[in-house]
């Protein structure tokens, strides 16, 4: 949580902006304690999580005109269940390779405020 900023809360998940200005990168964190894998959620929450991933993915595509979305559930370093949704373009700094190969670049205060405002506005539109 230190390297991310709260955007909004959905029914199941908290949505946070990862503090890496190289990529539009958000993280969905289901508000369920001690969940590590999607299979740890009950079936109702599994379905809700998939719906939230699809909802957020569509908004990310629209807001950032992506070439490709990377949707990843890794959790090797932070075991708490969380999903990364990263908007990629063919012009980004690590295309077509993984975002993990380039060093992150923190948002400036001004660009962070703009990014959070853009995401909040986009994610609140269709709810």
Predicted regions and their residues:
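HIT superfamily nucleotide-processing domains
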Residues: 1-127
């Amino acid at each position: 949580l230190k390297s991310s900023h709260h955007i909004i809360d959905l029914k199941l998940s908290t949505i946070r902006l990862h503090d890496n200005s190289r990529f539009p990168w958000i993280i969905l964190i289901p508000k369920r304690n001690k969940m590590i894998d999607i299979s740890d959620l009950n079936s109702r929450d599994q379905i809700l999580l998939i719906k939230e991933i699809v909802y957020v993915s569509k908004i990310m595509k629209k807001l950032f005109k992506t070439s490709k979305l990377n949707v990843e559930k890794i959790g090797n370093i932070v075991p708490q269940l969380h999903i990364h949704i990263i908007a990629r373009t063919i012009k980004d700094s690590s295309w077509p390779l993984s975002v993990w190969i380039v060093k992150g670049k923190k948002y400036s205060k001004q660009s962070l405020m703009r990014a959070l405002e853009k995401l909040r506005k986009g994610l609140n539109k269709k709810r």
